[in-house]
Amino acid sequence: ANAVKLTTNVFRDLNIAFVNELALIFEKAGIDIMTVLEAAKTKYNFQVHYPSAGVGGPCLPVNSYQMINFAKNFTSKTFELVENGRKINEKMPYHTVNLLEDALNEINKPLSGSSILVLGVSYKPDVKDIQISPIEKIIDILKEKGANILIYDPYFKNSEVFGIKTLDDFVQNLGILDGLIIGTAHKEFHNIDPEFLKSKMKNPIVIDSKNIIDQHLAKKAGLIYRGIGRGKI
């Protein structure tokens, strides 16, 4: 039974790693990965996975390392495929912050001293759970780089997460923001209006790690928008 669980979860982790690395390549090539995936999933045997800022939760990351350690009992070689998948998924928080820095460069603003709002800290949508959330790594990187960090998550209002007191409402704070990172695809965030963000934010930079905003509407609204695997618009 444990072998079955490890196999299914490591399979998912590897598929996410594949699409994350594909996203990094497509960004440089100017190809929108979401357009590609929407077309690819029309093929009956294609199992769609989506790129993001990383993989979290109590199962997938842990199970991949369990599989790596299990394999060491039977071979002198490392389980390179699984190890490389973990490396890819674990570098996605860094890439997310790189996208933010790239967007800030457009307005000649350093990340240090910038006010950045992180929307969503749960490792998956519509749950109150931050176990091994990749958003924690994003926040750690932002701290290291001297950003002023604000957090809003509808499941963690007026609490403390990752050493930061969370907001009970994010709209009233938009006017001080130099950037915004969508970290979790909570249903509440799917209805965010790009034009509203443009009208309220001090600097309208949006890093959409879940690709939930229509990038064409973002461009039309005048946002400085970056998605995972979407390139510049």
Please report, for each region that a protein language model flagged, where it lies by residue.
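Structural/interface elements that position substrates and couple domains in central-metabolism enzymes
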Residues: A1-I233
